[in-house]
Amino acid sequence: MEDPSKVQLNQLTDYIMKNCLWQFHSRKWDRERQNEGILTKTKQILLGEEVDLSTPADRCYYADALCLADAYKTEYPWINDMSKDELIQLMQQLKDRIDYVTITGSLNAELTDPRY
């Protein structure tokens, strides 16, 4: 039987990979900032924490995070029953996975091309 936490991580990752266009920024630094911004704000929304909206970038990431958090709560109702610590751990694992898939493990040479 597969580990339930891996199943949950795979479901959240799969949702992003199939439904979120923000993962396709063309530069490494764009992807790093967006992954950090969107996934941090998604975690804050899911935890009911206050979200920083002080900059235009914060507000942009918030818009994507709000959609992602709403989708997660609807598509994966188990997320609503997680403890704060479980959710924090899962969201960190998700960020690590998305960073790997979209940045460090990506074969897209444009991500590191200094002329692009």
Swiss-Prot record:
Stretches of the chain forming a coiled coil according to its record: none
KW Oxidoreductase (keyword) present: yes
The keyword Iron is annotated on this UniProt entry: yes
Keywords: ATP-binding, Iron, Iron-sulfur, Metal-binding, Nitrogen fixation, Nucleotide-binding, Oxidoreductase
Domain of life: Bacteria
Reactions catalysed, as given in the entry: N2 + 8 reduced [2Fe-2S]-[ferredoxin] + 16 ATP + 16 H2O = H2 + 8 oxidized [2Fe-2S]-[ferredoxin] + 2 NH4(+) + 16 ADP + 16 phosphate + 6 H(+)
Family annotation (InterPro entries): Nase_Fe-Fe_dsu (IPR014278), V/Nase_d_su (IPR004349)
Molecular function (Gene Ontology), one example: iron-sulfur cluster binding
Broadest EC class assigned to this enzyme: oxidoreductase
Disulfide linkage: none
Function of the molecule: The key enzymatic reactions in nitrogen fixation are catalyzed by the nitrogenase complex, which has 2 components: the iron protein (component 2) and a component 1 which is either a molybdenum-iron protein, a vanadium-iron, or an iron-iron protein.
Name assigned to this protein: Nitrogenase iron-iron protein delta chain
Native species: Clostridium pasteurianum
High-level lineage: Bacteria, Bacillati, Bacillota, Clostridia, Eubacteriales
Gene of this entry: anfG
